[in-house]
């Protein structure tokens, strides 16, 4: 149910140009390839080795979905992108590759001609929705696969060859959305290979700026196939230097930080003064990958802030329990807020954003037209005077702090426009590196996207300035575990539909695609 505050408030219109930043220009993708020590992948028509284990690996990687026990279906499956020669090299009985959308690149072949190569008429008819012909190269396929028709139904896109398509994968613009390379390394090298795929060695940088990092590699194994070829499964990912900023800071805090007591009684290791920068261009979303971040919670909370809400029950009813501890009867009473109903947080973030300076009575009292609407004022400046240096939103109101369940940690954001791009600098006074900061990074990235939609700008950069950056003592070991993980490329944000007003966006309107994080690392919240 919508709150009375949300229904009555004067809303912020979404700009007519908002649709231009609703999705990335190209669909992110991964490469799957088997190559020998010299980069050989075949002779242009056949694969010069028989490794049944590689075939099983290929099927598993390109077919399996990320959710536990989730089976592919037309409403959610992966896509495999291949050249015409690769399609023709598939045994007819295996065309199309099952449980995947088969995207075939050809300058001449039509979908009907591709389907005609399937001998079984029943299977040919069934394959009509499983094959797409694209008249062009990999870039054209990725542009098609990021369209509204495919964004939600395709989980991961895999480029599976041949040689020309692989080369396109490592060149701009496609390389800019490369997420991973799954490689089967075959030994010894085959003398019959005439087609090669040169993958840059880990740690080296290509002219396009690609630097690959090895995430994993198996021990060398011997195939049961003819010839007993040796093989290894290797996964390479583009280096994510932006997430490395976060990991390096966490490591430095653990190793060099000052041991301090704190309000919660848990204790911290702390450093003072740090900064991280994250690009938001082309809808890249800085959602950390070295552990799963609760995106739905990030999105629901930010939209709750944006509407000026202060009733934590609105979040709790949606399964978002991040404010339950601070909204509990016991916690409110400990703050002297005995007149508040349970889950009334007082004049916290959203109230300050939309009603700064107004008197706060309770979360049930409408404050429409009272105080300063900082968000609306910033949007007005972004449109009318984008060079303004006063586009600041602050949640830190000293006069209202005693009435807040919790003083704001992320307390001030300044917006900046350059060359049609909107950037945001966040100042955070208290920075819980284990739990809070990953959440805050994604939250202010989303805020920047939404402010760009309201002002007709493109998202630029998020600059995160940290004051007291700390790791709680009971988070040290979980953080050490996280530091051992190789960060993967960030995902992308898609707005499935635009709204007339900024406050009308729902979590269901916003989707994160190609998010492939490591599993959750449990950390207890200090209250």
From Swiss-Prot:
Binding residue positions for substrate: 32, 54, 160, 166, 184
Cited PANTHER family: THYMIDYLATE SYNTHASE, THYMIDYLATE SYNTHASE 1
Pfam family, one: DHFR_1
Sequence similarity: In the N-terminal section; belongs to the dihydrofolate reductase family. In the C-terminal section; belongs to the thymidylate synthase family.
Name under which the protein is recorded: Bifunctional dihydrofolate reductase-thymidylate synthase
Residues annotated as binding dUMP: 263, 410, 428-432, 440, 470-472
Upper classification of the organism: Eukaryota, Discoba, Euglenozoa, Kinetoplastea, Metakinetoplastina
Organism: Trypanosoma brucei brucei
HAMAP family for the chain: Thymidy_synth_bact (MF_00008)
EC number: 1.5.1.3, 2.1.1.45
Subunit and partners: Homodimer.
A Gene Ontology molecular function term of the record: thymidylate synthase activity
Catalytic activity: dUMP + (6R)-5,10-methylene-5,6,7,8-tetrahydrofolate = 7,8-dihydrofolate + dTMP; (6S)-5,6,7,8-tetrahydrofolate + NADP(+) = 7,8-dihydrofolate + NADPH + H(+)
Keywords: Methyltransferase, Multifunctional enzyme, NADP, Nucleotide biosynthesis, One-carbon metabolism, Oxidoreductase, Transferase
Domain DHFR as annotated: residue spans: 28-238
Protein's pathway: Pyrimidine metabolism; dTTP biosynthesis; Cofactor biosynthesis; tetrahydrofolate biosynthesis; 5,6,7,8-tetrahydrofolate from 7,8-dihydrofolate: step 1/1
Active-site residues (renumbered): 409
Protein's GO biological process: dTMP biosynthetic process; dTTP biosynthetic process; methylation; one-carbon metabolic process; tetrahydrofolate biosynthetic process
Ranges where the record places region Thymidylate synthase: 243-527
Residues at which NADP(+) binds: 34, 40-46, 84-86, 105-108, 161-168
